[in-house]
Amino acid sequence: MFNGFRFNGNRIGDRRWFCGGGGEPVTGTNVRAMDRSQEKEAIKSPIPPAIRVRELSFAYGGQTPVLNNLAWQVAPGERLGIIGHNGCGKTTLFLLLCGLLKASAGTIQLLGQALEAGKFLPEVGFLFQNPTDQLFATSVWDDIAFGPQNMGLSPAQVTERVNQAAELTGITSLLDRLPQHLSGGEKQMVAIAGLLAMAPKILLCDEPTASLDIKARRQLINFLGQFQQTLLISSHDLEFVLEVCNRVIIIDQGQIVADGPAQEIMADQTLMESHGLEKPYSLR
């Protein structure tokens, strides 16, 4: 365990799926029925969902909604992939979950707390498509330390977390380097180290493999495969989603059109093609 991160090398390839209260993939009109079922199960459960989205809608400047009345939830420790064709609303959804946009309607709860746009939640970590977007300090050490410093930890605690995170990610030799001089893979490892140092209970990843080579992509899969807190991934890299996630949601035209076990949903070629997606090569 690392400050709330639990590591278990057997997590990669784990296919213990979670689909709300059921075990079958849900598609089409059955999605709303599943939403109501999830709400009932949440009321019964003493443990609140890690993420709960209710009647969430968003439109840019009064235009046609990009997201329309979404309702879903994620259990603690669940690994959810959000997939869909370009322009379906995935990135907008993640910007809302990160608090970088304010919803036009509806609510988002993270760890039982209502999300407020612009509010920093140390329990929630973000890994962006371009790691450069979250590296801004004068040294790698300062970038990793930023999160713990804003959590109110003592200087000694911050130093301990930075050193532990750097050791776990194999970047101890980079701590004095300038972030802008690193390779894409090294930058991604620095971003991951910053997340490790914060020990988030929820990790949101938006297109995390987009700028990575094969080696860095495998390193990222290894780390996410061992992360046993709640994980959300938005990606066009469907093989990556299949390897890391146990559940997927397909979004099309701003609505959830399928929700279920990752392998079952993504193996359904008719379903995938009907929403502009290709069946992963490993399932063909």
From Swiss-Prot:
User: Known SUPFAM superfamilies for this protein?
Assistant: P-loop containing nucleoside triphosphate hydrolases
Query: Short name of one Pfam family for this protein?
Result: ABC_tran
Ranges for the ABC transporter domain? 51-278
Q: Which GO terms describe its molecular function?
A: ATP binding; ATP hydrolysis activity; ATPase-coupled transmembrane transporter activity
Q: Which residues bind ATP?
A: G84, H85, N86, G87, C88, G89, K90, T91
Q: What InterPro entries is this protein classified in? A: AAA+_ATPase, ABC_transporter-like_ATP-bd, ABC_transporter-like_CS, ABC_transpr_CbiO/EcfA_su, ECF_ABC_transporter_ATP-bd, P-loop_NTPase
User: How is this protein situated with respect to the membrane?
Assistant: Peripheral membrane protein
Q: Where in the cell is it found?
A: Cell inner membrane
Task: Kindly list the GO CC terms recorded for this protein.
Answer: ATP-binding cassette (ABC) transporter complex
Give UniProt keywords alphabetically: ATP-binding, Cell inner membrane, Cell membrane, Membrane, Nucleotide-binding, Translocase, Transport
| EC number(s) stated in the UniProt entry for this protein | 7.-.-.-
Group of enzyme by EC: translocase
SMART domains recorded for this chain? AAA
The record's family statement is: Belongs to the ABC transporter superfamily.
Give the protein's function.
Probably part of an ABC transporter complex. Responsible for energy coupling to the transport system.
Q: What is this protein called?
A: Putative ABC transporter ATP-binding protein sll0385
Organism equals Synechocystis sp. (strain ATCC 27184 / PCC 6803 / Kazusa)
